[in-house]
Amino acid sequence: MSEGLFFIIETFIKAVVILAVIACLAGLATYAERKVLAYMQRRIGPDMVGPVGVLQIVADMIKLFTKEDIVPANANRFIFLIAPLISAIAAFAALAPIPFLPEFELFGHTIRPILADINVGVLYVMGVASVCVFSPLMAGLASYNKFALIAAARAVMGLISFEVVSGLALLSVIMITGSLSLIDINNYQKGIFGWFVFKQPLAFVLFLMASFVECNRTPFCLTENETEIVAGYGTEYSGMRWAMFFIGEYANMIASSIVITLIFLGGFNSFWFVPGGLMMIFKASCVFFFFLWTRAAWPHLRPDQLMALCWKILLPLALVNVLITGIALI
């Protein structure tokens, strides 16, 4: 088999496998979240469908697939229908330059678990993540619903504001490594004390907080509040279109967990006798669990509180961190 044909087949298989695995993990994440919240709140959680309730995911899928797809009479039909797709597509597209595991040999060929090894991987992920802002905006505007419109405005406000913070947080890491490639940043962190969580702790905290906003997670979730704006920009959605928002949200959480692991927690570098692949899965799982834990442990912030936190505290801290990093590198 020629190298060109093998590359095409390999890329196609990797794309299918990555999409299938992340889609399955996004479904499993809903079950994991319900179980984690249940144990933290002294409840049992899903336990009726299958062993320990694990088949609840299948039951939810059947329910969502069989629900009627309703479009409000006054809604802009075309925009209303495509808005949920943008959320899921952008979340999956962000996975392209992410190396999930170390490379390995198979049938005499070196397999790299990454779709596109581009030298501007960080910039690509940031750019695609910013596209996610169009999904709630379009859903809110097209729904012809005041709750959805308010939620869309909140989502745009939060996402645009924290994109600045996350960009500045990553800038300090890029200044040290001199590369925008996620693989180069991962390879730079040799040894546990080489992790950027120790070299750039402030950048880590800032990027983590920005990830909460981009993933629409508590305590920085502005788009859903049953006492204020009901289900936010998803109020008028039903069936699988409603589910697409959550598939995108959980896929975003998984992607964010992997990116945080790669950039700040040593990525897939081996640790003592533990292989790099297992370390990658373990660290990303811990970050993902933190996303779930905060929902049960922290209250929501008001929009004005979140904006004050972003522009008055986090942004100045990010600028100071970049300045100090630059001075240290001179």
Curated annotation (Swiss-Prot):
Organism: Campylobacter curvus (strain 525.92)
Transmembrane segments annotated in the record for this chain: 5-25, 44-64, 78-98, 122-142, 156-176, 192-212, 240-260, 271-293, 310-330
GO annotation, biological process: aerobic respiration
InterPro entries xref list: NADH_UbQ_OxRdtase_su1/FPO, NADH_UbQ_OxRdtase_su1_CS
Name of the protein in its database record: NADH-quinone oxidoreductase subunit H
Function comment: NDH-1 shuttles electrons from NADH, via FMN and iron-sulfur (Fe-S) centers, to quinones in the respiratory chain. The immediate electron acceptor for the enzyme in this species is believed to be ubiquinone. Couples the redox reaction to proton translocation (for every two electrons transferred, four hydrogen ions are translocated across the cytoplasmic membrane), and thus conserves the redox energy in a proton gradient. This subunit may bind ubiquinone.
Recorded family membership: Belongs to the complex I subunit 1 family.
GO cellular component: plasma membrane
PROSITE patterns, alphabetized: COMPLEX1_ND1_1
Membrane topology per record: Multi-pass membrane protein
One Pfam family it belongs to: NADHdh
